[in-house]
Amino acid sequence: MSVHYTLNLRVFWPLVTGLCTALVCLYHVLRGSGGARAEPADGVDGGFPLLKVAVLLLLSYVLLRCRHAVRQRFLPGSPRLEGHAAFSSRHFREPGLSILLESYYEHEVRLSPHVLGHSKAHVSRIVGELVRAGRARGSPGLIPGGALALAFRGDFIQVGSAYEQHKIRRPDSFDVLVPLRLPPLVALEPRSLGEEPALAPAFRGCFLCALKAPPSPSGASGGHWLRDCKPFADAFCVDVRGRRHLSATLVLRWFQSHLQRSLATVRYSLEGRCRVTLTPGGLEQPPTLHILPCRTDYGCCRLSMAVRLIPAVHLGDGVFLVAPPPPPLPSAPLLELPEGLRAEALWGVNTARQEQKLLSWLQERAAPGACYLKCLQLLKALRDLGARGLDSAAATQWGRILSSYVLKTVLLAVLLRKGAPGQGWDEEHLGRCLEELVQFLRDCLLRRHTLFHCVLGPGGAAAEVGPLPKALREAAPVDLLAAFDGHARELAAARLLSTWQRLPQLLRAYGGPRYLARCPPPRSQRTQGFLEGEP
């Protein structure tokens, strides 16, 4: 996807100042190296003090120009002062929402493409070496003979906002799918749970994955196949209603131990470039690889990065099975499953490849200068502003209801209703476009609209994303907000609306240049939970 490069004044002007200072120091060193030169006669100036004064004047001029350029960029033109009228802030209009959004985007939201590119390059190199080492190492010792064990496929797939050009703030977290290779004797039969009776809404987007015999031209008996794949079934499967099903819990346990062994293999070769540590995870949080580069081409790119390594089982057509999504509330008791189902046998589905195709399809049909990705970034920033003042439990619930995936789905739903981003999605209508996204999200929270999964929805975008596996084509539509109860959704909608109404005040208080903060900061809203209504 295209990336627009703009001049970053926060980097450019300090760089110019540092360069001028370096030139002065270099001149001083070169002048001092001629020690054998005779001192000038009394009353004769050597010229260096005059040069220092000139350089100081130049630096002062540069700083004044920098300040003037920023003011002219983010403030509307001020009326001319006539006579000897006193200079007062009343001569300036308060900046409008569009100016505040642009200022906040440039100072708090926008990522440097240069730093993001270097961060992604570091992640690709380190994860690539780790995955190749894991593939070469194999899976010794877990299963007798080793031929019926899982293994790394040898590649990895970069997913998430960092690779879809809508990540915000810092390029310090990434998501990577690590595909696993099944033994040749094992095939999978995935099945959606969307039509399962008496199933809680939180599980309707999950899948079961039963084992089955692959097609055999020799016509081997089923009993012979069951006997041959018994070591694999004992190590990675659980019984569900009389059949062996692949277990996400057991696969993740193997994946973490195999990652640890693979990291021990490549750690020595990585010591000269970076420090790498691995944090174990669980079903709610996959293992995380922490990378701190020791040396880079540019000092500005020495960022500590966290890479979530997600084990994935390929279903076909770029669709993967991954660990199921976390429960809607972290403190809520575990939801009961219907008789015969087991939580460790549940899988989620990852359609990142299809979503990337859908974004590319929209970009091809978008009008020149469309800002829909910028609107998505600002919608994420709006969510972060809305979390201010909440306690940790309420902030966690707010973040899960308005997750980045939900916000991306809101954007895709709004755009697909119109066919493509038209002329109304340009920079001049940024505030109106953002308001449209907020209103649609509020309506989804209040059940006026249903926020379906962009691929697993009714009709969906199958024509734009290409073919899908049979299990996904036959799956029931998935409502992304169905897991949350009505009370939590109403409170989130009220919080979202109040955040939007106070957005100019929040933008002045928390972002942009200090001279935009002409109003007092928002009152303290430290609450134990969501707001019950409008503030």
Swiss-Prot record:
Topological domains, Cytoplasmic: 65-535
The keyword Transmembrane helix belongs to this UniProt entry's keyword annotation: yes
Keywords, ordered alphabetically: Membrane, Phosphoprotein, Signal, Transmembrane, Transmembrane helix
Pfam families: Mab-21_C
First and last residue of the signal peptide: 1-38
Ranges in the topological domain labelled Extracellular: 39-43
First-listed, main subcellular location of the protein, grouped into a coarse class: membrane
Protein name, entry field: Inositol 1,4,5-trisphosphate receptor-interacting protein-like 2
Recorded family membership: Belongs to the ITPRIP family.
Recorded topology in the membrane: Single-pass type I membrane protein
Membrane-spanning intervals of the chain: 44-64
Compartments where located: Membrane
Phosphoserine modifications at: 139
